[in-house]
Amino acid sequence: MERWWFNSMLFKKEFECRCGLNKSTESLGSIENASEGDEPDIKDRTKNIQSWGGRDDSSYSKVDHLFVVKDIRNFISDDTFLVKDSNGDNFSIYFDIENQIFEIDNNHSFRSELKNTYWNSSYLNNGSTSEDTYYNHYMYDTQYSWNNHINSCIDSYLQSQIWIETSIVSGGDNYSDSYIYSSICGESRNNSEGEVSDIQTHVKGSDFTIIESSNDLDVTQKYRHLWVQCENCYGLNYKKFLKSKMNICEQCGYHLKMNSSERIELSIDPGTWDPMDEDMASLDPIEFHSEEEPYKDRIDSYQKKTGLTEAVQTGIGQLNGIPVAVGVMDFQFMGGSMGSVVGEKITRLIEYATKELLPLIIVCASGGARMQEGSLSLMQMAKISSALYDYQSNKKLFYVSILTSPTTGGVTASFGMLGDIIIAEPNAYIAFAGKRVIEQTLNTTVPEGSQAAEYLFQKGLFDLIVPRNLLKSVLSELFKFHAFVPLNQNETEH
């Protein structure tokens, strides 16, 4: 594979890139005039370029002049970024779009070579000038020390985080958008010693392998009582403020998981929540045999862990003054699996809403039917659907289904998709069978992102994608449109 190596520092202003090219002097001529409209032949240049694998300190000895690349997408396929954290520790980040690798390395020789290149650059020696004011400011003013040069280039990115957003060419005309985000913790990094761990992350429809020092994971675990790590961008969110931000990542806007109590607090007016059937719990109806933890013991452990009796909370409350019947599933309780108790509680909620002529909201978050209860869990699909038929078709009442991540299995195949209005959260994972199950069963590859809310919305699977901060107002408007009014307004009219 042909590889290009760049050491790039991002400017805050206009995101210009200052790059040092690791090249062979035999394959590359002068690059003083490299610009957006005047690009050398990439294929000829790559013949003698050093590869990342099996490198030693001398592999960086051919770093050449610093220059400006204004249109990075037409210039590189593999990228190495030189960065420094808040403690002053330097390391490089290698990004290979073709092999889908994102690697963090602590080799300090790279910085030394680039530093020498900076001071020995032909631009400085020749005293030439450029039309680029930013380039002049950072490159020609020799009163700036090397450290000031680095700090000016990276600035706020290296104090707390790195955010690189660019388009990169991979060996042809196909462009691949890459969004790379990495938190820099306040702990000092060691020199690439110790074990290495692989982490899979989802980046704009692609899976990249992040190879990171195990020390970073230790730091995350050490401060997990203070911070919540985003599962999408791996950014850290201060736990104390996360609840007030509705569990939405401050860095990338990803909707993190919420438990059922938090969702009730988000949507229902304070002081109006009246729970139903709180004491109903499963008694292991088929005496499910398990070689590991018995089913009843597992139920007990989840009850202690979550403070709930089952994987759903049901009750009556008010949404902006409008009385509603609400059921909220909790994925933290056995993956939100639907057993006999979950099905019974939801059925009773629907029957109560039918009797009292209330609008109905069910928030879905489930892995599907609970296997420990066998066919009893499967029959809940038909039981709930039957109750909904009477509610919707006979009584002509209004049911809103809200699909959160993940919503799969029997819930998707029953009441999850029976709403008069079906709303999904952004980036929600919605499917009947999971990706792994499909691939192992059918021996075929499931396209990346084909089970995401945005893709399914384009296919017409549901009606709306609504962020959490707008959900309550959207629900309120929907209910008013269907002639459900707040209690105080109803009393005034009568």
UniProtKB/Swiss-Prot annotation:
Binds 1 zinc ion per subunit. Its cofactor is Zn(2+). A zinc finger (C4-type) spans 230-252. One of its GO terms (molecular function) is acetyl-CoA carboxylase activity. It comes from the Eukaryota. Pathway: Lipid metabolism; malonyl-CoA biosynthesis; malonyl-CoA from acetyl-CoA: step 1/1. Acetyl-CoA carboxylase is a heterohexamer composed of biotin carboxyl carrier protein, biotin carboxylase and 2 subunits each of ACCase subunit alpha and ACCase plastid-coded subunit beta (accD). NCBIfam families: accD. PANTHER family: ACETYL-COENZYME A CARBOXYLASE CARBOXYL TRANSFERASE SUBUNIT BETA, CHLOROPLASTIC. This is Acetyl-coenzyme A carboxylase carboxyl transferase subunit beta, chloroplastic.
